[in-house]
Amino acid sequence: MLRNSDIKMDFNFLWLILAIFVGTYVVLFGFLRRVNDWYYVSRLGEKRHSLPPGEMGWPLLGNMLSFIRAFRTSDPDTFIYNLVDRYGRTGIYKSHLFWSPSIVVCTPETCKTVLMDNERFGRGNPESTKELLGKKTLGLSNEEHKRLRKLTTNPFRGDKALTMYVGYIEDIVIDLLDEWAGMNKHLVFLTEMRKLAFKVIGHIVFGTTSDHLLELMEKYYTDLLLGLRSPAINIPGFAFYRALKARKLLVKLLQDVLDERKKLSGIEQQKGKKGMIDLLIEAEDENGKKLEDDNIIDLLIINLLAGHESSAHASMWAVLYLYQHPEMLQKAKEEQEEIIKRRPSTQKGLTLEEIKQMEYLSKIIDETMRRTSLFIPIFREAKTDAKIQGYTVPKGWQVLVWTRGVHMDPEVYSNPKEFDPSRWDNHAPKPGSYIPFGGGPWICSGADLTKLEIYIFLHYFLLNYKLELLNPKCPVAYLPVPRPSDNCVAKVVKLK
């Protein structure tokens, strides 16, 4: 039989063990939470006192767990809201995200400062993005990059360039909508939209190429996209491993196309079928030196990626938002019917002038881009120690322009979670408050083409088709980009 003294001794021993366990946990927890601060902040010396508010998170992981947790809920904006609640509305915070020490900017003023100042803030990307899109090309000097950017921008910009593409985009949209409706079954709408957009950008990049080749490339891009923001861990089972394999297959395909195009370039020029690839093959610097194949392939990979993801996702979301708001759907449809009524009876197909008359559809597209904020963040890197609103941004730290933080800020847009095209009535957004395509010297060169594709797709869809969703209440997944978790399984039905 146990005596009271034995029971008391055992009880005290258990308390001692528990106290040691809790104490060890607290000390270890506190130590681990301070490692990043000691490693990244303390080494800055006196500059550390003028860093923005915030915390550096866990070793290696930083604040990625908080980021992922927020973006796996139904309200990803809690990530920024939590920073504002804890540290005040400074518009700039220190953190450790995407595997690097970071400064997050999320107000129009701070975003504008970073995007417009190319002297202090240059291009910056996670290591995984550099590996997958091409370190050699992403690491070019500013002057060389400007020269190449001009080459790759010219095919996308200006009325003359866009007018050339209207008819081609129309043909693709009309044919594929008719094909989808003819299937008379549910399909993965987002996947089909990505294929549509890839056909368009493929035509612009290559001038002409086989549908089979474009379909193969589009499949590789699916894996490539999933690895862009993931940790650069090249081990089977990780997204980066699959993405790197996809890049190698893409490089091989593009090298074959490049070799073939070099042989045929003279003939193609005579036919007038010139794509971006031909401009890159012909490009020379001031010393007459041509681009190496590696550079050309990297530029093709970057432009093919940028040229189809935005338009595919935005077109899908525009349709979904309109179906959630029947009165907006009807108003948008009536505008398209009016455009048809006003055109001469001899005219076939859309013109760029008609597209410019789509005022309500323009507001729908702008609101779709704001509400979805497809790609966050925009990556920059501090080229030198810089000051923003009195806070220090250390040289070498990545600067994350949090587009969603601006687009979903109730002080910038009233009721930001509401889809409301009327907010664009007679509204000119102030600099830094509407940045779906970035801003400054590195603004997305394909922004005009992206919107052109969306206009043309919505025009024909609204007039002739409807969407029957398999899962109307499907939850939204926000990583890597916002989309219905089933990728919008739906049936495209031709209107009678």
Swiss-Prot record:
The protein's role, per its UniProt record: Monooxygenase involved in the biosynthesis of glabretanes, limonoids and quassinoids triterpene natural products such as ailanthone, chaparrinone, glaucarubinone and amarolide, allelopathic degraded triterpene lactones inhibiting the growth of other plants, and possessing antimalarial, antifeedant, insecticidal, anti-inflammatory and anticancer activities. Catalyzes the epoxidation of melianol to produce 7,8-epoxymelianol.
Protein name (database record): 7,8-epoxymelianol synthase CYP88A154
Keyword Oxidoreductase carried by entry: yes
Binding site for heme: C444
GN (gene name): CYP88A154
Family listed: Belongs to the cytochrome P450 family.
Molecular function in Gene Ontology: ent-kaurenoic acid monooxygenase activity; heme binding; iron ion binding
Cofactor: heme
Coiled coil segments of this chain: none
Highest taxon of the lineage: Eukaryota
Source organism: Ailanthus altissima
Keywords annotated in UniProt: Heme, Iron, Membrane, Metal-binding, Monooxygenase, Oxidoreductase, Transmembrane, Transmembrane helix
Lineage: Eukaryota, Viridiplantae, Streptophyta, Embryophyta, Tracheophyta
